[in-house]
From Swiss-Prot:
<dbReference type="GO" id="GO:0060538">
    <property type="term" value="P:skeletal muscle organ development"/>
</dbReference>
<dbReference type="GO" id="GO:0050890">
    <property type="term" value="P:cognition"/>
</dbReference>
<dbReference type="GO" id="GO:0009298">
    <property type="term" value="P:GDP-mannose biosynthetic process"/>
</dbReference>
<dbReference type="GO" id="GO:0009890">
    <property type="term" value="P:negative regulation of biosynthetic process"/>
</dbReference>
<comment type="similarity">
    <text>Belongs to the transferase hexapeptide repeat family.</text>
</comment>
<dbReference type="GO" id="GO:0045936">
    <property type="term" value="P:negative regulation of phosphate metabolic process"/>
</dbReference>
<feature type="binding site">
    <location>
        <position position="85"/>
    </location>
    <ligand>
        <name>GDP-alpha-D-mannose</name>
    </ligand>
</feature>
<dbReference type="GO" id="GO:0019673">
    <property type="term" value="P:GDP-mannose metabolic process"/>
</dbReference>
<dbReference type="GO" id="GO:0048644">
    <property type="term" value="P:muscle organ morphogenesis"/>
</dbReference>
<dbReference type="InterPro" id="IPR050486">
    <property type="entry name" value="Mannose-1P_guanyltransferase"/>
</dbReference>
<dbReference type="GO" id="GO:0051402">
    <property type="term" value="P:neuron apoptotic process"/>
</dbReference>
<dbReference type="InterPro" id="IPR005835">
    <property type="entry name" value="NTP_transferase_dom"/>
</dbReference>
<feature type="binding site">
    <location>
        <position position="247"/>
    </location>
    <ligand>
        <name>GDP-alpha-D-mannose</name>
    </ligand>
</feature>
<dbReference type="GO" id="GO:0006486">
    <property type="term" value="P:protein glycosylation"/>
</dbReference>
<feature type="region of interest" description="Substrate-binding domain">
    <location>
        <begin position="2"/>
        <end position="251"/>
    </location>
</feature>
<dbReference type="GO" id="GO:0061744">
    <property type="term" value="P:motor behavior"/>
</dbReference>
<dbReference type="GO" id="GO:0004857">
    <property type="term" value="F:enzyme inhibitor activity"/>
</dbReference>
Length: 420
């Protein structure tokens, strides 16, 4: 018997995902046509012996989350439950706080997945590796280039046994090109080190003179408090993958993740990909179109395009490397490139909405997405264009490398701006 835990965080996380996270919790943002964490749940449901999937976070259980959980339970015929933390508890605190629910039914092991990663989720391969050598912690690792590895948790392994000898979260100097994917397989014994950290935090808290400044005994950071401390003690091992993987920290990385998932649909869900049909729009590459969307036959879509529920695409529209969300309208002959068009937004005819891709270097197979800040030297860096919810773009204007916050009605062109 197996279980899975998906760590979905909470509203004060995902600030780099704004303005998109204003409308829906980041884990429910549609990537390649389905909510981000549905990819995780699909992968978990395919593992033989999976009995239950738990979501842990500190979002209020609103209508969107409740509807998603109900739909997921029906689709995958598995219990999918949300466990709400009373306060942000870090990547490990929620696991310890809800340990009784996780261990109910005596699972052989349980997967732990961060919500903000895109992957092909080689969970069965991880389970096989775990059953060959049973250890408390198994981490999924991949490689990054020397410079970008500093942005991730870095793993030094024993090449023969794959034991983790050293672990540093976001080191200041180069440690290793093997990085942590944020996908784990834990045995029930893995909760004992979490208990030790909790008890140590309790003692430290009692010694603190100003308890108001102390985050609380329940806050446990898996990476710093557990992995770094236990590395080299024969408890943590790494399983390397060369499959697709990327973090989803910013809106730009959601667009890149959409491309990776759409490419993977060729193998896993070919029925989700649009096909060129007589009298239909021209399809280039991998495109997802929701069944309720209305697309004019003279439109040209793709590659890497995802069109949401109730979207209207007018005659002569050109759409490439973009996500168009629920209820948006692209009027005749608009051109949308490297952009995300928000819920219920309207782009006027002959308007152009364009961004600059921030993709990994295609000439470096180990390159990853750069999660840079929006600004450098006081200037907005070129990036994808994002239109928030219910934005209105007039006819015949250009919106380039800009972020437009929700409910704005523009009257002219903008370049390299954040429109508040």
């Amino acid at each position: 018997m197996l279980k899975a835990v998906i760590l979905i965080g909470g509203p004060q996380k995902g600030t780099r995902f704004r303005p998109l996270s204003f409308e829906v919790p980041k884990p429910l943002f549609p990537v390649a046509g389905v909510p981000m964490i549905q990819h995780h749940i699909e992968a978990c449901a395919q593992v033989p012996g999976m009995q239950e999937i738990l979501l842990i976070g500190f979002y209020q259980p609103d209508e969107a989350l409740t509807q998603f959980l109900e739909a997921a339970q029906q689709e995958f015929n598995l219990p999918v439950r949300y466990l709400q933390e009373f306060t942000p508890l870090g990547t490990g605190g929620g696991l310890y706080h809800f340990r009784d629910q996780i261990l109910a039914g005596a699972p052989e092991a349980f997967f732990v997945l961060n919500a903000d990663v895109c992957s092909d989720f080689p969970l069965s391969a991880m389970l096989d590796a775990h059953r060959l050598q049973r250890h408390p912690f198994l981490l999924l690792g991949t490689t990054a280039n020397r410079t970008q590895s500093l942005n991730y948790g870095c793993i030094v392994e024993n090449p023969q046994t794959h034991e983790v000898l050293h672990y540093v979260e976001k080191p200041s100097t180069f440690i290793s090109d093997i990085i942590n994917c944020g996908i784990y397989l834990f045995s029930p014994e893995a909760l004992k080190p979490l208990r030790d950290v909790f008890q140590r935090n309790q003692q430290d808290g009692q010694l603190e003179e100003s308890p108001g400044s102390w985050p609380g005994a329940g806050t446990i950071r898996l990476e710093q408090d557990v992995f770094s401390a236990l590395a080299g003690q024969g408890q943590i091992y790494v399983h390397l993958t060369d499959g697709i993987w990327s973090q989803i920290k910013s809106a730009g990385s959601a667009l890149y993740a959409s491309r990776l998932y759409l490419g993977r649909y060729q193998i896993t869900h070919p029925e989700r990909l649009a096909r060129h049909t007589a009298g239909g729009p021209r399809i280039r590459g991998n495109v997802y179109i929701h069944p309720t969307a209305k697309v004019a036959p003279s439109a040209v879509l793709g590659p890497n395009v995802s069109i949401g529920k109730g979207v209207t695409i007018g005659e002569g529209v050109r759409l490439r490397e973009s996500i168009v969300l629920h209820g948006a309208t692209l009027q005749e002959h608009t051109c949308v490139l490297h952009s995300i068009v928000g819920w219920g937004s309207t782009v006027g005819r002959w308007a152009r909405v364009e961004g600059t891709p921030n993709d990994p270097n295609p000439n470096d197979p180990r390159a990853r997405m750069d999660s840079e800040s929006l600004f450098k030297d006081g200037k907005l860096l070129p990036a994808i264009t994002i239109l928030g919810c219910r934005v209105r773009i007039p006819a015949e204007v250009l919106i380039l490398n800009s972020i437009v916050l929700p409910h704005k009605e523009l009257s002219r062109s903008f370049t390299n701006q954040i429109i508040l």
